[in-house]
Amino acid sequence: MSIHPMNIQQPVEILLVEDNPGDVRLTREALQGSAISTRLSVVGDGAEALDFLHRRGPHAGAPRPHLILLDLNLPNKTGLQVLAELKAHADFRRIPVVVLTCSEAADDIAQAYDLHANCYIAKPVDYGKFLHVMGVTQQFWIETVKLPPA
């Protein structure tokens, strides 16, 4: 089953991998305006993201995400390490990963795409611009694109 506004039967499961509580709050606010039902799960570090995806420990009952929003600057495992493990694993490589980070470093951008990130977005620091970028992101990744089944 593909996820599309006209035939959606369930909420779009989104995993946000973000250690900054302010950015988590802003992302939640931005996603609330979606025309499609979304369910946001949040983990605060790279190791926890992998536990969530592998359904280990406290994440044994975690939903499989349709989309992952991944920060690069994370404790325990960096976003690039998480991305490398995701895209190397047959069960996770089709899940689209949107890198959503403060870094605008050319090396980070190149490495993310080399590791098969589906998109790289530098987080705007301005509140209004952040909401706009998240709105455009959700319109594309949630309301327009056909995502693989969870």
Model-found features: residue ranges?
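Alpha4-beta5-alpha5 "output face"
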Residues: 87, 110-114
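Short, glycine/charged-rich "phosphate-handling" switch motifs in NTP-dependent
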Residues: 118
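Negatively charged, flexible loop motifs adjacent to catalytic sites
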Residues: 20-23, 75, 91, 103-107
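Short amphipathic alpha-helix used as the core "switch/output" element in two-component signaling
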Residues: 32, 58, 80-93
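Conserved phosphate-binding and hydrolysis motifs of nucleotide-dependent enzymes
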Residues: 19, 71, 79
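Acidic catalytic/metal-coordinating carboxylates
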Residues: 45-48, 78-84
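Active-site residues of response regulator receiver
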Residues: 70-71, 101
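Non-catalytic signal-transmission and effector/linker regions of two-component phosphorelay proteins
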Residues: 1-16, 21-41, 47-50, 54, ...
